[in-house]
Amino acid sequence: MWLQQRLKGLPGLLSSSWARRLLCLLGLLLLLLWFGGSGARRAAGGLHLLPWSRGEPGAAEPSACLEAATRAWRGLRERGEVVPLGPGVPALVANGFLALDVAANRLWVTPGEREPAVAPDFVPFVQLRPLSALAEAGEAVLLLREGLLRRVRCLQLGSPGPGPVAAGPGPASVSGLAAGSGRDCVLLQEDFLAHRGRPHVYLQRIQLNNPTERVAALQTVGPTAGPAPKAFTSTLEKVGDHQFLLYSGRSPPTPTGLVHLVVVAAKKLVNRLQVAPKTQLDETVLWVVHVSGPINPQVLKSKAAKELKALQDLARKEMLELLDMPAAELLQDHQLLWAQLFSPGVEMKKITDTHTPSGLTVNLTLYYMLSCSPAPLLSPSLSHRERDQMESTLNYEDHCFSGHATMHAENLWPGRLSSVQQILQLSDLWRLTLQKRGCKGLVKVGAPGILQGMVLSFGGLQFTENHLQFQADPDVLHNSYALHGIRYKNDHINLAVLADAEGKPYLHVSVESRGQPVKIYACKAGCLDEPVELTSAPTGHTFSVMVTQPITPLLYISTDLTHLQDLRHTLHLKAILAHDEHMAQQDPGLPFLFWFSVASLITLFHLFLFKLIYNEYCGPGAKPLFRSKEDPSV
């Protein structure tokens, strides 16, 4: 009875405003205590709520696995050495002869230097499909300094169906895969690359780490694990202990009606990969591609047999050579050659406007252009005589790069690329630009020369007969950037445009000696001061930015001291100004029209004010200024 009476009186109690406020306050305190206690339990490793699985069983496990596997990419991404794939970043790996779109699984081959790329109807890579996957998370990036595309997938697998074990586990070490991968998650890492030193070779490295208690099984889909493409015929080649597939076919006709014969040798891969619990698998699939020159379809029947046999012999010979090499050695050789090739470059430090390309845009453009350019200088089959000739061509002080800098040329440094075809067109545009600006010798050398020309063009550097000059526009020095690895004689020069604490630009120059040291001198605009000898000291040398009238280069670098000393007498300058004085003259202030408009508005305002005062005191019906005492209105 007592409880019933209290419950009947509860609505009356809640009708009071102070009671409702007290209940709200108590509820708020309970919520705060609940959240505080749950946070303490999580910090102590106690009981806590499971993460939201988004409707997929175990979805949180692959995400945690992926986070641990890609943690090392963060620092590389900040330095611009790793670029995640996405819109505006095509998944291209290439070496100047082969170009492969990993995302679309397409292949392009460039038969000759001035011939357009052809696209055979051949699926280049093997696709891996997990059996009974419950959840999956993945990410793919371009490793710019290694010249490859890496894709990481974290798989939560169910029990695979019955089937023979097609590939057993191996003791190969999968670096970076085991750490933090998760006990219930299988980690799959794939590397895709077109070998830099072997233009006809591309490969796919498959690394599978299975830390779970069950067998991991993946289905392989591709030409090496299934039937041959429609446009190709395949034969199984057996030489000793080696087996590989040999595909023969033709490319689609070009716009001119010509066709190319294509032969592909591929390492045979089983239809199903299975990895036992607590083991790892490391498998590398190799391909060798050879293509003929353009052939008229009318004479194709008479030439096809002979051409195909020659291409098959070349592909067979190279594939046998590769199968005798350790796969890790082949991959390491590619990475060393690519790092050597990508040592020069452009580093964007500070950008203060919107029309200057970002560091990501510059690095991606350099990567794509290097990928699309052949590098005969890196070929292992190159003779000593040919190598020496190319080295001399690369070190020849041609008149590259003539004209204004390309820093703000948006068609040469595009912020977004949508497809591999657009990259191939951009490569042709860069070649044409460099050839027309005095860089024919560098373009002839291939990828190292093209990279040298791109770095020179970005900052406005030009070689002359006796010196290297930095002729950037003084009006764009508000951006800070550095040009690395400029080849001069036998040394490499690093040139940076930096800003001091007051925002005034200055030049920093350092030298990296290669081989026998050579004395190199430099002087700033006008060369009025005595030239300074550049050394390989880590601190380098700094030069203030001076601007001459008329405009001349901001810096001269030469091995001939007498030439620089004589140069001051041949420039015939009217004046030499500091950079801030030059900018003050270039920007005299607001235009005349602005000040004329302001003066007109002020004049009109005062005229209007004068008119109001005149009408008030001097116009018709105006009140007198002074009133007498006799005025009755006072």
Swiss-Prot record:
It is a single-pass type I membrane protein. It holds the Pfam family DUF2152. Residues 611-634 are cytoplasmic. GO terms for cellular component: membrane. It comes from the Eukaryota. Keywords: Glycoprotein, Membrane, Signal, Transmembrane, Transmembrane helix. Residues 41-589 are extracellular. Residues 1-40 form the signal peptide. InterPro entries: K2013-like (IPR018795). Its main location: membrane. It is found in: Membrane. The chain crosses the membrane at residues 590-610. Glycans are attached at N363. This is Uncharacterized protein KIAA2013. It comes from Homo sapiens (Human). The lineage of its organism: Eukaryota, Metazoa, Chordata, Craniata, Vertebrata. The gene is KIAA2013.
